[in-house]
């Protein structure tokens, strides 16, 4: 086991809380050798300075997770391969959210540098840096954008990073939002959802090299948005993520939110209003339909495709479903996924575990026999899972190549004390 040397009180604060949890998490997943675990833990430790000062932050809250933690874990299960651990991080520093750095832009370059240095696969950041340059507002634009944010939103993050741990390998994804730049530059007449989407799509089409190859999928999404004018539409797009690999292979995901959980609405979105219905999509929808009531924790959703499950917290901005539209130069139609905010439909981790283990058993995975519950119990030691909710989102997908695959996103409990 490697020994981690904390660099300062803030690093020590995060290390004491998160390092043991991350080590247990990747160990319990069961897909990594001891050497691989040690290497990933050392890399994880190198990221902790980018989480910002010890809690409470003097100026802002992390917006990556519903619990305002700047970091999350996730596990991906699949028919086709071993489980894969992932993590997501929102970089912050001690001035993030202050008057001098309203949208926490100043800390992003340093985090980029640490991440690129820690990857074991080839990294290509050309597209990422182009979007960062396009969407980072000036201080003047930030001052204009801040009061234009939707009521209840304190800050929109300009950067999330996702890291995948696949055996020895680590690969990274960059996420950003166009909203601060858009709100800081839009006129009163053009400050609307349609204009915001157009601003984003235009920036993606201009990416070099290869942005023009994304046109067929982008056209299909924009056509859907323009022809499906209803309140359930997952528009406007909220943020965008992309793989930091060669642009000829990179995926770009655009995330929006629909406030309806009715499966009829999911079908409409997944098929772009019926325009993108294929044999693969039909199989995907059939599999998703068979477990939808378990994802929503409501038997009413089993037989009624129009049933819209009420959220546990209707006042939250994170209601309904998160939807991603994935485009790449390799395909001419977008790949669409839905993400269920489990904390909105499961009061506790125990409820979530019970439903997910039923799903895993239906899918023929050995994670349905108590293994998944053990992952959380052994990771979050001392946490009463019958009284907590450490689940964030859960996604399900299907493809001919990978079969069924799911990702469960987890939020580490917030430190109970701000002492190191």
Swiss-Prot record:
EC number of the protein: 2.5.1.-
Residues bound to L-tryptophan: 65-66
Protein name: Tryptophan dimethylallyltransferase dma1
Organism of origin: Dothistroma septosporum (strain NZE10 / CBS 128990) (Red band needle blight fungus)
Keywords: Transferase
Matching Pfam families: Trp_DMAT
Pathway assignment: Secondary metabolite biosynthesis
NCBIfam families assigned to the protein according to its UniProt record, in alphabetical order: arom_pren_DMATS (TIGR03429)
Membership in a protein family: Belongs to the tryptophan dimethylallyltransferase family.
UniProt xrefs under InterPro entries: Aro_prenylTrfase_DMATS
Taxonomic placement: Eukaryota, Fungi, Dikarya, Ascomycota, Pezizomycotina
GO biological process: alkaloid metabolic process
UniProt function note: Tryptophan dimethylallyltransferase; part of the hps1-dma1 gene cluster that probably mediates the biosynthesis a derivative of cyclopiazonic acid (CPA). The hybrid polyketide synthase-nonribosomal peptide synthetase (PKS-NRPS) nps1 might incorporates acetyl-CoA, malonyl-CoA, and tryptophan (Trp) and utilizes a C-terminal redox-incompetent reductase domain to make and release the tryptophan tetramic acid, cyclo-acetoacetyl-L-tryptophan (c-AATrp), as the first intermediate in the pathway.
Induction, per UniProt: Barely expressed under any of the conditions tested.
